Amino acid sequence: MSINEVRYLPECGSTNAYAKEHFEEFGPVGAVYTTNQTAGRGRLGRSWVNAEGKALYYTVAIREPLAQPATLPLLASLAVRHQLQLRYGVDCQIKWPNDLLLNGKKIVGILCESVSYGYQQQGRGILCGIGINLAQPQSYFCLLYTSPS
């Protein structure tokens, strides 16, 4: 599965919301990313606090049918964890169902959502949104993520 299109937005309310609104424009697989997300959210409607220029927010929009869509949050967690370890030597832990922790503090949040599209909303797809804290001071983690959501 290869990505057909990747869009960069200097600022975005929510990459998941943007990907949902523009879902049919992406082709089978597309992505959108930003470093300034002003209305991000997590599971159960929880807010995700923006840290302009200090985090990467992106969403992959998948129209291809997945055999086991419920496994996508775990697969995304494993993939992000592997890349952080491989590229940066960061050894983080997975907190099921959608977080990665470093020294007990949340550094990655993942939100997967289903989306309907097409004629009478009969098509089915999935969005996988990932927020990664990149350059936060220690105080940021102490204030915001003392208890991961």
Q: Predicted segments — roles?
A:
Residues 127-135:
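Conserved beta-strand-loop-short alpha-helix elements that form
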Residues 1-86, 108:
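N-terminal lobe of the biotin/lipoate ligase/transferase fold
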Residues 145-149:
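Conserved small/polar residues in nucleotide/adenosyl-binding loops
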Residues 136-143:
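Cytochrome P450 core scaffold surrounding the K-helix E-X-X-R motif
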Residues 45-50, 114, 134-136:
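Basic, gly/Ser/Thr/Pro-rich low-complexity segments located predominantly at protein N termini
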Residues 79-121, 130-131:
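Acidic (Asp/Glu) carboxylate-rich active-site/surface patches
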Residues 36-41, 49, 95, 100, ...:
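Short glycine- and Lys/Arg-enriched binding-loop motifs that mark or flank ligand-binding interfaces
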Residues 54-56, 124-128:
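Residues at beta-strand starts and edge strands
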